[in-house]
Amino acid sequence: MKDEDKTKIINAVTNLSTALKKYHPNTETCNYVEITLTELKKKDGKAFTGAFLYFLTKASMLRTSENVSLNDTESKLWHKMSALKNLGNDFFFGMGL
């Protein structure tokens, strides 16, 4: 993954985290996004890509199970962040898939 792609993802997760802290501060979803953001900042390469792709799945399931209803701002940020999953296409390179 290119450095600029990693930066886009970090910025998107940061923006979502900020919004969740404002509108849903005491939810597991908010806490998970914040913890994952800290972890993503420490990772590079395939470890970063794998962690981000896992995060997308788990965060979505957690949000659904908690019945967190996103407002318009959060929804736009969530979709913007989720759209970046295509940047993780390098994850399976060389695995014959």
What are these regions (language model features)?
Residues L20-R63:
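Amphipathic alpha-helical interaction modules
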Residues K8-N15, Y32-I35, E39, Y54, ...:
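Charged, amphipathic alpha-helical oligomerization/scaffolding segments
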Residues K2-D5, I9, K41, G45-F48, ...:
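Intrinsic-disorder-associated interaction segments
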Residues M1-C30, N86-L97:
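Short terminal alpha-helical segments
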